[in-house]
């Protein structure tokens, strides 16, 4: 069965996302910046030290229910580092059942991992240029660019 959270795991929960305004957002993309937001994230050896934060199943279901098509995170995976290959968060995001090898139900949805958003970039609404090359594969590099939106 799908492994659950273990003592000491750092979780990104549905409640945390809702506290951050997920339910009120009318956006296609969501950027999640975990704390502490240290510049060392850019060069960190993620296999050393404590495991990085990851999304709970409930958090992933909330993201899908909110209509998020593009999820960008500052950790190496939306799933627990040692999840025995289940990739539960990825499967939920793309609309796949556990252990399914079917084509995703949300083929246009994207996950971008290991981004870095400095503290000098305030929380808020941005236009996102994701810039993903047209590779026919399950993973491709992306270059997300954010442009602040101003109310008129």
Feature annotation, model-predicted:
Residues 1-152:
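Active-/binding-site microenvironments in catalytic and ligand-binding cores
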């Amino acid at each position: 069965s799908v492994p659950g959270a273990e003592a000491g795991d750092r979780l990104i929960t549905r409640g945390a996302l809702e506290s951050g305004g997920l339910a009120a957002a009318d956006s296609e993309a969501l950027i999640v910046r975990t704390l502490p937001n240290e510049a060392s994230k850019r060069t960190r050896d993620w296999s050393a030290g404590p495991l990085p934060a990851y999304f709970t199943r409930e958090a992933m279901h909330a993201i899908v229910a909110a209509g998020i098509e593009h999820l960008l995170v500052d950790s190496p995976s939306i799933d627990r580092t040692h999840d025995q290959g289940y990739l539960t968060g990825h499967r939920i995001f793309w609309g796949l059942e556990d252990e399914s090898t079917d084509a995703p139900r949300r083929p246009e949805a994207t996950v971008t991992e290991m981004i870095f958003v400095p503290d000098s970039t305030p929380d808020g609404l941005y236009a996102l240029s994701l810039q993903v090359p047209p590779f026919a594969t399950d993973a491709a590099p992306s270059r997300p660019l954010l442009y602040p939106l101003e109310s008129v």
